[in-house]
Amino acid sequence: MNTLQKGFTLIELMIVIAIVGILAAVALPAYQDYTARAQVSEAILLAEGQKSAVTEYYLNHGEWPSNNTSAGVASSTDIKGKYVQSVEVKNGVVTATMASSNVNNEIKGKKLSLWAKRQDGSVKWFCGQPVKRNDTATTNDDVKADTAANGKQIDTKHLPSTCRDAASAG
């Protein structure tokens, strides 16, 4: 007795559903990391926009600008984007704070910093976790990890490879 099978059996359909589920389980976290990295790139872009003003201030005055106003840039809350709440200049360190809404949960309210050090007559910039410089007129340009930002550091996997410098870099 030969019967002609038409369509899919229940087992075949279950296997297809299992494969789709596995693919979704792998793809979804990868996509979330991708969106977080894209949102962090906005913070880096906005922070990098302040580098020239900070460098110019340093070259003209011999010390780091103490705040946004002395650096000649807009106030920290005026420098913002879709995913960035503010960009603050403090003692020559530029710190971007991610927004607390409409942003990936893993980076909500988190921070990253850009800071400069003198090197052979020029200024070299670094990028990484939040740091602070205690004095504008420091002679060694040392920065240290910002302990007030504990729990507010962006996970390294969301930072571009060019933005993973440590506070001791340089």
Curated annotation (Swiss-Prot):
- Which key words tag this protein in UniProt? Cell adhesion, Disulfide bond, Fimbrium, Glycoprotein, Membrane, Methylation, Phosphoprotein, Transmembrane, Transmembrane helix
The Gene Ontology biological process annotation of the record reads: cell adhesion
Where is it localised?
A: Fimbrium; Membrane
Q: How does it assemble?
A: The pili are polar flexible filaments of about 5.4 nanometers diameter and 2.5 micrometers average length; they consist of only a single polypeptide chain arranged in a helical configuration of five subunits per turn in the assembled pilus.
Quote the NCBIfam families the UniProt record gives: IV_pilin_GFxxxE
Q: What does this chain do?
A: Major component of the type IV pilus (T4P) that plays a role in cellular adherence, microcolony formation as well as twitching motility.
Instruction: Please report the name of this protein according to its UniProt entry.
Output: Fimbrial protein
Q: What species is this protein from?
A: Neisseria meningitidis serogroup A / serotype 4A (strain DSM 15465 / Z2491)
